[in-house]
């Protein structure tokens, strides 16, 4: 079973390999020349950016200091809305609970939104080992699932993959893809992924997603994409 694991002891070896990887350098070079400047531009267009960031930090610190209270409040509100909250003490308990829910519906296919907790507990491999096919629907997660890799970043799971590598991955995995069809730009790659994933959404028996925020007042979950 593949789970995220600490790799600090392998840093020197991994760093040497990464510095010699020209495709990785290309992928990260695009990040440096596009994503970072775009973030700076967006922040500059929001005069209250620093104040909002400070407010978010203070809220996070407060919530972490009272997490037991807010989790119980969240559970209460979820139950009032007819939902269920399952408490799991460790990764194995969480995996077994997910499997129990899937088996209750005789699920054969599960579509997944991005969930770092799912990565941490190795839910994809666990489901596959138990006869349930997990299908990632976040584009970055879908790409690395096809490549059988782990995420390179919590926000951009496939930041380390170039467009050329994505094209090669799709041509290998999508066996019905026309060999003459161009997949040279981001728009065509996204269209190909969208066409495949739309059908998987419709076929799925169960859906799994993470959450960026849990709202204790209402029992709601918030996903930022």
Predicted regions and their residues:
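The feature marks the mature, well-folded catalytic cores of soluble enzymes
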Residues: 1-225
């Amino acid at each position: 079973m593949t789970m995220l694991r600490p790799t600090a002891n392998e840093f020197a070896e991994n760093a040497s390999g990464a510095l010699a990887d020209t495709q990785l350098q290309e992928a990260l070079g695009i990040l440096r020349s596009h994503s970072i400047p775009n973030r700076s531009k967006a922040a500059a267009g929001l005069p209250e950016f620093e104040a909002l960031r400070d407010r978010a930090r203070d809220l996070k610190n407060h919530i972490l200091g009272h997490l037991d209270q807010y989790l119980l409040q969240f559970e209460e509100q979820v139950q009032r809305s007819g939902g269920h909250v399952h408490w799991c003490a460790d990764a194995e308990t969480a995996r077994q609970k997910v499997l129990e829910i899937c088996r209750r519906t005789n699920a054969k296919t599960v579509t997944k939104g991005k969930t770092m907790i799912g990565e941490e507990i190795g839910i994809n491999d666990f489901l596959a080992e138990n006869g349930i096919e997990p299908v990632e629907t976040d584009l970055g997660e879908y790409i690395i699932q096809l490549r059988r890799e782990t995420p390179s970043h919590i926000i951009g799971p496939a930041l380390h993959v170039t467009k050329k590598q994505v094209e090669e991955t799709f041509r290998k995995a999508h066996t019905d893809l026309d060999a003459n069809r161009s997949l040279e730009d981001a728009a065509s790659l996204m269209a190909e992924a969208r066409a495949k994933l739309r059908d998987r959404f419709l076929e799925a028996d169960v859906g799994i997603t993470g959450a960026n925020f849990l709202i204790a007042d209402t029992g709601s979950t918030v996903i930022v994409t």
